[in-house]
Amino acid sequence: LWTKVNQFEIEGLPQSALKVVNTIAKKAKKDKNDAQIVKSMLFKSKFALILEEDAQLKVINDFKTEIAQSEFPTTNILESLLANLYWQYFQENRHTFYNRTKTEEKVDTVDFRTWDLQTLFEEIHLHFKNSLKSGLMLQQEDLRQYYVLLQVATESNGSKSAAGMVIGSNASSGSGAQSYVQFQA
């Protein structure tokens, strides 16, 4: 089915691709295939952002819902992805955030688009931190089921990298988080 999604995407038919992704997502939920659930979420998000105006809020809320329903290590992966979604939103709208006044509390606890810069960065930090929970277990986690999501580095002995290395790298330096960390300091 992913081949169909890719074909529809190449043909410029995101609506058709989204229908196939929704089918994949339903099957993944039924089969409790966490890697396919996460992959389908990423593609649903991608197509929502193409097809719907202001889809960011829905995408973020979908990730929060899935995090609440997931277990280790899927929760950790989703937390990392959510932090990155917030970070990408900041990157695309940094001028707006730099012009906002800091508020005492979140103006709207659900709609991150109304938050000030400090509130957004606190949320990013929270989700990166959550992605690193159970660090020792993450380092020992077998990633084979997540090959559909990650480009896994193969060590010289042929064993696969630990999830903790991938998520830890993401939380500390991936996706432009260096700027975030420097700003926080």
Regions found by a protein language model. Give the residues of each.
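Extracytoplasmic/secretory-pathway proteins
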Residues: L1-A185
